[in-house]
Amino acid sequence: MEKRKRESSERSFGESESVSSLSEKDSEIQPESTMESRDDEIQSPTVSLEVETEKEELKDSMKTLAEKLSAALANVSAKDDLVKQHVKVAEEAVAGWEKAENEVVELKEKLEAADDKNRVLEDRVSHLDGALKECVRQLRQARDEQEQRIQDAVIERTQELQSSRTSLENQIFETATKSEELSQMAESVAKENVMLRHELLARCEELEIRTIERDLSTQAAETASKQQLDSIKKVAKLEAECRKFRMLAKSSASFNDHRSTDSHSDGGERMDVSCSDSWASSTLIEKRSLQGTSSSIELDLMGDFLEMERLVALPETPDGNGKSGPESVTEEVVVPSENSLASEIEVLTSRIKELEEKLEKLEAEKHELENEVKCNREEAVVHIENSEVLTSRTKELEEKLEKLEAEKEELKSEVKCNREKAVVHVENSLAAEIEVLTSRTKELEEQLEKLEAEKVELESEVKCNREEAVAQVENSLATEIEVLTCRIKQLEEKLEKLEVEKDELKSEVKCNREVESTLRFELEAIACEKMELENKLEKLEVEKAELQISFDIIKDKYEESQVCLQEIETKLGEIQTEMKLVNELKAEVESQTIAMEADAKTKSAKIESLEEDMRKERFAFDELRRKCEALEEEISLHKENSIKSENKEPKIKQEDIETAAGKLANCQKTIASLGKQLQSLATLEDFLTDTPIIPMAANGVSSSSNSESWKVHKNETFMTRNHPESIKPTKETSPSSSSSTASAAVSMPVSTNRGSSEKNRNGFATVFTRSKDGIHLAI
């Protein structure tokens, strides 16, 4: 701002000086013109023709001068604008230089910060290198220790596992052998048990059969004895009846021969019917009974035959009503037949009840057998080891049940067949037996005798056989039971031992399995630890690789930063050298700026005086215009007057012509002075147009002829050594990579066409101009 004020004050001072100089020149010209006008008035009037021509020339010259003045004024205004623009450009250049210096300072600060960062990074890198080396060393030590521990633990565990495996294999082999032996023993024991059970069942069945046979033999003996007694009684009765019949036959053989035959036939038929009824009832009873035998059937038949013979042999009793003897006999026979039917019905009902009781017993036994089968099945489910034996037993029991049921059905069918056969046989044999009754009585007597003898023999044999069989059976059963009990005890002891051994083996197997499980868990834990350690090692290796990568990146950055630092240091060296040159130039520039400021002040004063002169000249030019116009009017009037008074006043015309010629001479003088002033203005134009180019650079200026450089410093001044004619531009690139300032060449040729006298006369000091090449400085 102070500089602008100074420049504006210098300009105003120079303009005032220029105006004052112009006014002085006008004042000098005016007395000269007055003096010349007075001299011209004295001249002759012969110059009137020349005056007209001169007036025309003056008009033309005035026009040309007016045009030149307008052009000069336009040039002056344009040059003022250029001066303002050059001042702005100089200010901008100074601001750019300040910015460049600030950027240089910032770059220095950044370089210092980068140096600090690089130092910190170097420290960190060195620290990280040491830490990495320590980590790697610790990792290697830990890895080696862990590998050694793992190897030792694995070797120990493998040895322990091998020893335990060998021991377990031996134990397993022993247990397998023992189990095989035990299984063989168990199979043999099971087979022996099965054989013994089969033997027991067979002996039990034999005992049951023998007991049944004994009971049957006793029952047969009892029935035989009873039948013998009944037969003896019946034989006695038959003998008595036979005697009676013989007596009756002898007494009434002749009289009742025909009737007796009819009655015998009727009674035989009736007896046949009653006998058939009784035999039918007896057959029904035998069909329903399950334990009837052929011997009992024959005894019953014998009893029935005896009853029929007794009924047939009843004597005929005559009735008082005039009935014959055979009719009374038939009536007497019907009554006991009805009684016999009732008794047979009672017997049948009793037998039916007995059969129902037996059926209930059989059903109860069947239920018991089924319950036993169920119990056996439950025991088979509970006792898995004896399942085969129990299943075989249940199968055998079921087979026995099926066999019993089949035998039962076969017995039923046989009983039915026997009964049917017996019925048919009885029906067929009744007729023959009735015919053979007489012959059979004799045979019966013989048979009774034989039977008595056989009975005695049988009783003796039965007693002997019973005693022997019972003794043998009891002895054999006792011995077999003792043997079986001993075997069962031995087998039970063996089973207990085997169970104890089995429990021991199970406990050992459990212990071995627990040991194996613990060893497996330990192995799994070791494997897990190994995996964890491997994972940790992998993580550490990954971290190491990442740290190595970061270290390499930091190294690269460090190398790049070192390269940048070297470049920056080189650039700083160059900048320092340039700064030294700038500092050297600074003093020169300051001294020159002081001189230039003094010259500028003087020249600004001169410019002001020139401006004042220009104003005065303009004022004088306006006055001259007015005078010229007035003169033209006067000339026109004078011509008119001269035309009117050519003959009257020739003397007056000559005087007027002389005055006009003097005025013309004065005008010519003023025009000459104006031409000189215009020439001085033309010199100003030449100075302004022919001034050298001064391109400003941010970093420095180098000269071409004398190798002298121009630099801009902080005091916003230009410095040079010996006023070189021209300063050629040089370019320098900024040292830092982040910011670069474009350098512009500055050239400052000084024109030597005019001398120092002309410069002082013009009153211009340093003038800045701007063109395509840069800033121009004219002195």
UniProtKB/Swiss-Prot annotation:
This is Filament-like plant protein 1. InterPro entries: FPP_plant. The keyword Coiled coil applies. The keyword Glycoprotein does not apply. Residues 324-336, 733-752 have a biased composition (Low complexity). Interacts with WPP/MAF proteins. Pfam families: FPP. The lineage of its organism: Eukaryota, Viridiplantae, Streptophyta, Embryophyta, Tracheophyta. Residues 1-14, 256-272, 718-731 have a biased composition (Basic and acidic residues). Disulfide bonds: none annotated. Keywords: Coiled coil. It comes from Arabidopsis thaliana (Mouse-ear cress). Residues 47-200, 337-674 form a coiled coil. Residues 1-55, 253-274, 315-336, 718-764 are annotated as: Disordered. Belongs to the FPP family.
